[in-house]
Amino acid sequence: MEFNPTDNLDHTPQNSSGINDREAVKKQYSTAEKLNIRISIHSKYSTNKQGFGNWIASHYDIRDGMSVLELGCGTGEMWAGKQETIRRCSRLVLSDFSDGMLDKAKETLRGYDGIEYRVIDIQDIPFGDCEFDIVIANMMLYHVPDLQKGLREVRRMLKENGKFCCATFGEHGMMEYIEGLFGIGQNRGGAGSSFTLQNGEEKLRAVFSDVQRLLYEDALEVTNVEDMVDYIRSLTGMSELRNLPRDEIRPVLEKNMTGGVLHVPKEYGMFIAR
């Protein structure tokens, strides 16, 4: 499989009480504009040049004749340039909870053959039992109101030797760092912590018998503060920061730069469950 080194994901979790509220999620992902801002900062400043999306995809191990379902496909960028992989699939279904995001995925992958597009809620997947070899759900499980119901639906979809690939964030990465810079009270026990690298294995083991955790080593080295200001203002769920004027955000970031660089820790990874 050929990978684009700038591929990235960022459905950045935000410590909002609405993170797993259906309408809040629909609003956050109704258009691709804010998501693209968050994707861009990773593409531009990540120290790991493989790209998080490429790293995730390298663990799918899609073989000839496999059926694949992605839940929460976002803009579809994960599949751009992957025609060879798509051709291997006997069936590839890309789905999202948001109509607007699914429209963007169709636009991104216009001209690609062999892809089905569906609006799907993970809690009520409209397929029969044992239909897929691989089910994918990246950076979205913390949005699911009834996570265990969603995971049971995924398990129902999988063939006997199928696997579930799901990427998520850790509790000590970008958001914790940004909140610390601005002295915002950290709500680590809220809905944003419902599926993390720290607690995800336990949640998955309630449904799956074999769970593996993989960690992605990375950070941001930001040299243009304006890009970080844009990033912060794209965080729909963090009104305390998003509503601050740019002129109040900028000096806080500049104060924490060293040698013209703002070092931002990242904590991302994925689980593979069977």
What are these regions (language model features)?
Residues 123-135:
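A short acidic, Gly/Pro-enriched loop at the edge of an enzyme's catalytic core
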Residues 67-124:
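Class I SAM-dependent methyltransferase SAM/SAH-binding core
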Residues 133-147:
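A short SAM/SAH-binding and catalytic strip from SAM-dependent methyltransferases
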Residues 3, 42, 48-49, 75-77, ...:
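Conserved Class I S-adenosyl-L-methionine
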Residues 2-64, 77-81, 101, 165-191:
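Conserved class I S-adenosyl-L-methionine
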Residues 67, 161-163:
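Short glycine-centered segments of the SAM/dcSAM-binding site in methyltransferase folds
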